[in-house]
Amino acid sequence: MQLISASEGDTPCCHRPPPPALLKGIEEFNQHAYFECHETLEELWNQERVGRRRHQQSPHRSSLASGCDNLYKGILQVGVGCYHLLRRNYHGATVKLQSGADYLEPFAPVCMKVQVAHLIADARLLRAELVALGPDHFTEVDLALLPQVRLAGSTQEE
């Protein structure tokens, strides 16, 4: 089965503006406040899942039942991977960076103005560097490789 990127209209939620909680979580992520980012995005993720479940049970549901809960979960998990790296947990860092990137794939290249493709690439680059260094030397990684979440149309855009 081939996934269609969000820019091709596969995920209707991607066309919505980013909710304030997502913007707050992104700000926390970019400030390396990964614990706070986790709390913010986990609440948003749970709200989206509950709302989608309620919507799917409604007899009047529409095709808009597709939510962005896994977008939030993907960003959250990349942040958790960074948190583990900063806490010197090799296994946690490599596993969460990979799973976060995997959750984000269906939303690339851009969803809710988040430059998802860039975040995936940055997370995978950091993970590859960690793996190359190995569990005995991963703490030598250049922390400049910590991903940043970029928004399309913002001044942080390259």
Predicted regions and their residues:
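Hydrophobic/aromatic side-chain positions at a characteristic register within alpha-helices
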Residues: P17, L22, F29-N30, L85
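TPR/TPR-like (Sel1-like) alpha-helical repeat modules
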Residues: Y90-A108
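A hydrophobic membrane-anchoring alpha-helix module
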Residues: L133-E158
